[in-house]
Amino acid sequence: ATKTNDKISYSDETTFVNNVANTGVPSIDPAYYYVKSSVIKAYNTANSTTVERNFYEIEGLQEALKYFKSFDNRDIAEDYNMQGVIIVPSRAAFARDNSIYGTAYQNRSFVFNFQLYNTRTRLPKED
């Protein structure tokens, strides 16, 4: 959204990720949802920085997904049955923060249509 003459309006839309139209294969733990600690550590070491999870992850998305139940033992090849929609306002997403995507997604709201499959608690060795 942009503010001009004290009026707020939405700017142009951009597709962030679209698995249905592209491969049809669901994303499994994409970095905008969950990034491993080892990835953050490697980035910080390589770039002499101290970035945290919010450098990669869209804040608020994990919390919102907790309100939806996963479809267990469902074949990934089955057609999508969009389970829900989550809208993450720009101030809760990347806002004006520095991110791995640069400035491309600053001040952008995100709308996620999704289907959750076979969720489980992440094991410590998977981080």
Predicted features and spans:
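Cross-family detector of peptidyl-prolyl cis-trans isomerase
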Residues: 1-127
